[in-house]
Amino acid sequence: MIITVINGSPRKNGATSKVLTYLYKDIERLIPDVKINYFDLSEVNPSYCIGCLNCYKMGKCINQNDKVEYIHDIITKSDGVIFGSPTYGSSVTGLFKVFTDRAHMMLERLLYRKPCIAVTTYENARGSKAISFIKSMVLDSGGYVCGSLSIKTGFNQNPITEKVESKIQKVSKKFIYCIEEKKNPPVLSQIYNFIAINAVLKPMAFKDIEQYKGIIDRWEEQGII
C-alpha cells in the first residue's frame, strides 16, 4: 500500500503538519508495511503555472526545476492521497493552490477513483471554506473524499487533543478500509465524473487531438477511455 501526504502549509512544523503526521503514523500503526510519501510544499517551493498548456500536449509540466512533476508521478502510483492545508484568508494557502495548478491534476483526472482525505486547521472561522476547496479539487481530479478533518486550534498550539486523536483514528481506519476493499466512489461522485468526462472533457479533447494528446494518453493509461 502506497500513501502520499501533501502538506500545503508554509510552516513545516505547524498545526497542519502535526495533524498530518499523527494521521500517517496512525496508518503506519495499523498497516506496518505501508509506504508513506510525505511532502512539505514549503520545501518544494513550487513555481507558478504559466498557462502554457504543455501538460495538455505532452502530459508533463514544462517546468522541471522543482519536484512538482516528481510528486505528480508519485501520486499516480499511490493507492490513496492525503491533502492538508491551514486556512489562510478563508481558503487554502497560496502554496497549496500553486501546487494544484502546477500538478495538472484536473483535466487528466490524476486522482481517478483514488480515495483521499482532506485536512485543514483553522483558528477562528472559515475552516469549512478551506476544506470545501480541497474536497472540490479532489472531485474535479477524479478522486473521492472518504474522510475529512477540520481542526480548530490556536496559533502555535498543539492541535492533537484526545478528541482530535479519536477523530483521526476513525478517519484513518475508514481510509484504509476504502483502499483495501477497493471501494467504489460514492454514487454522486461517479455520476459527476461520468458527466464531466463524457459531456465536457472528451468532446473538448477530441476536437483537437494533437493539442490534448498528453491528456488522452493519460486517460488511456487509467482506463478512462
Curated annotation (Swiss-Prot):
Residues annotated to bind [4Fe-4S] cluster: 49, 52, 55, 61
Disulfide bridge partners, by residue number: none
Molecular function in Gene Ontology: 4 iron, 4 sulfur cluster binding; metal ion binding; oxidoreductase activity
UniProt keyword terms in alphabetical order: 4Fe-4S, Flavoprotein, FMN, Iron, Iron-sulfur, Metal-binding
Cofactor: FMN; [4Fe-4S] cluster
Similarity remark: Belongs to the SsuE family. Isf subfamily.
Assembly and interaction partners: Homodimer.
Function: Redox-active protein probably involved in electron transport.
UniProt name for this protein: Iron-sulfur flavoprotein CD630_04720
UniProt organism field: Clostridioides difficile (strain 630) (Peptoclostridium difficile)
